[in-house]
């Protein structure tokens, strides 16, 4: 592997003109002879998911003319494209090859789309020693952002040499002047910084002495921002996670209004319950379709394709439900709700006589006590509705903890959330088995009304139903031990240690 040293050129861009580059590298000519290669120019489109999943994993994906190029540890990888790609794109829509194999796991269920487009030029200069032997290559590259904003060209000079001493000697000569500096990071990083990306839209952190009404309004504005940020992706069906994150923000809003909405002036809006109901059918179908291949592989009888008519029916149902979802999200009712709510929150005066710390002590105590009381009441004879109620209370505690996290002691917070998540996982498995069983029966009835599905499909669906019932029974069996662990003295001690004693309501 050749040695690479990265430098930054601080002078005016050269456009990679032959004479201009040779002039800037002239400090090397007393020792070396320089032979410039041809000038190359291209456009690059950098791709990532909306939440920057590739970048977080050290991957840089570019669409160049006719190919996808991925840089990262162990790379680069390149896949030639059969035609012009369409963005956004899920992993399954990418051309088969090394690039898709590498990014599929990082992308998860999210789609990639252009983050920025750049115009790039480069020229390689061969460095020869006194005997005429090539000892290094100097690549002079200039990159300018084109979209979403135009940026001035950034010049990156890369010294490559088989031997470390040659690379270091050339770099040392260049760095002796005042126009070169040591560089680090990638071209992509530099372009992102110059373009003001990634955007970081964050609300002020909640502090202990903040008025309670201002603290709650701040948290709710953050949730409103999250709802707004996911509307377009949901309407355009970019990927299923946009709808999921929109729903999470709605649930957080409703939970916080229930827990601390009395701190705000006026009656809380009731429209978020409507948004929850509007988005539920499509999300339920998304979950089914995302898990479909896994469910099909569980089948122990029949053929793998027996469930394909069921998949097609789910897609038909989803298309129908999505039409209603899109109408709702594009309606005046939804826009009035979101705009009016955000405006009202921005007008909260912050005149409460109660501090955020005092409110946290009071409400976390109430919500935690409610969870512990419901958890202690669960027995083997408890109804599914009782278990579902406990799950809802656990979510409310989880959201409350997230809101007041800046005020909590870090270690007790970590332990409380860990214990709570463990219980939520069991409760979720129980409810998923119940809900999916009910939905499966409903989908089977609708398939029969729409036509005459193959007997093999109905038999395979029957096996799925049995597995959902088995999942629910297994979760019910696991629930007892999960509750015992959660109700132990450790959880109560950790809850008590979340906040200073003076803040914890008695």
Give the label of every model feature segment:
Residues 1-506:
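Function-determining surface determinants
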């Amino acid at each position: 592997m050749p040695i690479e040293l990265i430098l930054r050129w601080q002078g005016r861009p050269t456009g990679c003109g032959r004479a201009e580059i040779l002039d800037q590298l002239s400090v090397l000519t007393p020792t070396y002879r320089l032979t410039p290669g041809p000038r190359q120019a291209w456009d690059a489109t950098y791709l990532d998911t909306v939440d920057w999943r590739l970048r977080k994993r050290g991957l840089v994906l570019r669409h160049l003319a006719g190919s996808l190029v991925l840089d990262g540890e162990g790379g680069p990888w390149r896949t030639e494209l059969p035609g012009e790609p369409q963005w956004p794109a899920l992993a399954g829509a990418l051309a088969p090859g090394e690039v898709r194999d590498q990014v599929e796991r990082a992308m998860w269920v999210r789609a990639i789309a252009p983050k920025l487009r750049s115009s790039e030029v480069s020229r390689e200069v061969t460095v020869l020693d006194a005997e005429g032997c090539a000892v290094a290559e100097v690549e002079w590259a200039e990159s300018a952002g084109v979209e979403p904003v135009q940026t001035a060209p950034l010049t990156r000079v890369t010294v490559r040499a088989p031997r470390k001493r040659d690379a270091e000697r050339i770099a040392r000569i260049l760095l002796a002047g005042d126009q070169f500096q040591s560089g680090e990071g990638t071209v992509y990083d530099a372009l992102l910084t110059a373009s003001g990306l990634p955007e970081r839209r964050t609300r002020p952190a909640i502090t202990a002495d903040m008025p309670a009404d201002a603290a709650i309004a701040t948290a709710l504005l953050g949730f409103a921002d999250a709802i707004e940020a996911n509307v377009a992706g949901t309407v355009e069906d970019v990927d299923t996670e946009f709808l999921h994150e929109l729903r999470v923000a709605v649930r957080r809003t409703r939970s916080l209004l229930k827990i601390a909405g009395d701190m705000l002036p006026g009656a809380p809006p009731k429209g978020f319950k409507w948004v929850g109901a509007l988005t539920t059918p499509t999300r339920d179908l998304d979950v089914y379709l995302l898990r479909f291949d896994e469910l099909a592989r569980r089948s122990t009888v029949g053929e793998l394709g027996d469930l394909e008519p069921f998949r097609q029916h789910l897609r038909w149902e989803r298309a129908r439900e999505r039409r209603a979802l899109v109408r709702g999200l594009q309606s005046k009712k939804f826009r009035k709700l979101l705009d009016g709510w955000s405006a009202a929150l921005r007008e909260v005066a912050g005149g409460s006589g109660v501090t955020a710390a005092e409110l946290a002590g009071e409400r976390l105590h109430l919500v935690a006590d409610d969870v512990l009381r419901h958890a202690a009441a669960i027995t083997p004879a408890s109804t599914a509705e009782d278990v579902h109620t406990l799950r809802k209370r656990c979510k409310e505690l989880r959201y409350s903890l997230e809101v007041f996290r800046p005020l909590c002691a870090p270690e007790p917070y970590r332990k409380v959330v860990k214990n709570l998540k463990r219980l939520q996982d069991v409760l979720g498995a129980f409810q998923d088995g119940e809900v999916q069983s009910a939905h499966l029966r409903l989908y089977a009835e609708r398939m029969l009304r729409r036509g005459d599905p193959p007997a093999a499909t109905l038999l395979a669906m029957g096996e799925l139903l049995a597995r959902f019932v088995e999942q629910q029974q297994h979760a019910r069996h696991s629930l007892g031990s999960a509750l015992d662990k959660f109700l132990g003295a450790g959880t109560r001690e950790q809850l008590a240690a979340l906040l200073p004693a003076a803040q914890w309501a008695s």
